[in-house]
Curated annotation (Swiss-Prot):
Protein name, per record: Peptidyl-tRNA hydrolase
Native source species: Alkalilimnicola ehrlichii (strain ATCC BAA-1101 / DSM 17681 / MLHE-1)
Site (Discriminates between blocked and unblocked aminoacyl-tRNA): N16
Keyword ATP-binding: no
Cell compartment(s), UniProt: Cytoplasm
Lineage, uppermost ranks: Bacteria, Pseudomonadati, Pseudomonadota, Gammaproteobacteria, Chromatiales
Gene designation: pth
UniProt similarity note: Belongs to the PTH family.
Amino acid sequence: MTDSPQPIQLIVGLGNPGDRYAGTRHNAGFWLLDELLRRHGGALRPERRYHADLATLHLGPHQCRLMRPQTYMNRSGQAVGPYAQFFRLPPESILVVHDEIDLPPGQVKLKQGGGHGGHNGLRDIIRALGNERGFCRARIGVGHPGHRDGVVPYVLSRPAPDERRAIADAVEELADCVEWLLAGDWGRACQRLHSRS
């Protein structure tokens, strides 16, 4: 992917709400929202009609909305679908940030469109958008447990300290690129993120 048809207007960080899941691999999308708010200010506020917490991010001449669904991961579409429909957001203007077990900790990859790859949060968003798959994704590597039977407990657990540092570094680098994504400069963001070892 080198270009996006338009700048990002909504960044959705996927995860599970509640203290029980805080800091788990599955909540990598939440980690990005926390980092953006730490850097640029603002606060997430509950919007019950969208089953989500929302904030507005101001970054240079650009702004977008940040969304943290308050459904569980498997029902993320209950937040994204109604919001996108109400504001008539083209799928290409939505960036969904999620954990990716097929990438090692410390890697981030951007992608536009595609399937869900077994990720239940993406699966539900695709369903809620009327089988539309054209939204953008930021895939934050969290590593793989080695066998598919171990995936659920793995993503719902907290990473070891060295893995956590690698994931946090990747989140920080993704946060560095957000202004380019808001401007639609996907080529520049991809060049930086995809060159990470």
